[in-house]
Amino acid sequence: MARFDDDQRRALHEQNRRSWNAATEAHNSHKHDQAGFLKRGGCTLFADELELLGDVDGLDLVHLQCNCGQDSLSLARRGARVTGVDIADAPIAFARELAAETKLPATFHRADLFDWMATSDARFDVAFASYGTIGWLCDLDRWARGVRRVLRSGGRLVLLEFHPLVWSFAGSGALAKPYFLDGALDEAGVRDYVGVDLAPSGHLDGVQEFANPERSFGFQWTVAQILQSTVDAGLRIETVREYPYANGCRLFEDMTPLEGRRYGMPACAPAMPLMFGLVARA
């Protein structure tokens, strides 16, 4: 596992911050009346994370890498006392505006997650992260230690992510790069990935042909690295799941649409894990 000093870490994460700031307007341009959707009782969460989370009513929950806060506010509606943390300015500004407009109670912090977890005095019953989160972080061990620090004794980490195996394949489904990769992957920037299935409030054409002017850096963690970092941080793994479908995201061409805004592998392809879930207790 590659190691980065604090200066390198900040440089990598700050570049990702700029890239996410550049992409946020394009992402939200495709989502119709998000505040109205939430005020009417709408929920942006998928059944799988709700099943892993269980009943959150009355719990203190930190949403790690919360992006624009739609899922955070969906959890607040379910009774959780929600704190959201994200490195990028534009998503946090949007989340705060959405919370004010919906009158759903949640607190949002703009910070590098590593810095925030190392210094926050707050403690939580649940630390939650989902869909495209840990692949933006340059040190998985530091992430897991930070999660352990902000959890109360008996608190839970709940993680639902795209399976690391999928990043070895191109959109065509052809094997494109090794599963085992070390170091930072220099990429073209956060893309505009928001389609119909990521806009439950209603999809709009919005920004067309978005090209991000800011590059980004990704990190390809294996399942073993994720589990080992969790264990090494002192968290006790309780649940591990693999799913043969992807929520809200057409990862490959010709994927099969399924109920619940899911996609399965193309009919001509063998089944493979497309997401995984993890619950670990402090």
PLM regions and their residue ranges:
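N-terminal, positively charged/glycine-rich alpha-helical extensions of SAM-dependent methyltransferases
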Residues: 1-35
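Conserved alpha-helix/loop element of class I SAM-dependent methyltransferases that forms part
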Residues: 32-60
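Class I SAM-dependent methyltransferase SAM/SAH-binding core
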Residues: 59-116
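A short acidic, Gly/Pro-enriched loop at the edge of an enzyme's catalytic core
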Residues: 114-127
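A short SAM/SAH-binding and catalytic strip from SAM-dependent methyltransferases
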Residues: 125-141
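A short glycine-rich, Lys/Arg-flanked "PGG" loop and its adjoining helix->strand segment in the class I
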Residues: 141-156
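Conserved class I S-adenosyl-L-methionine
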Residues: 156-203
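Short alpha-helix
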Residues: 217-240
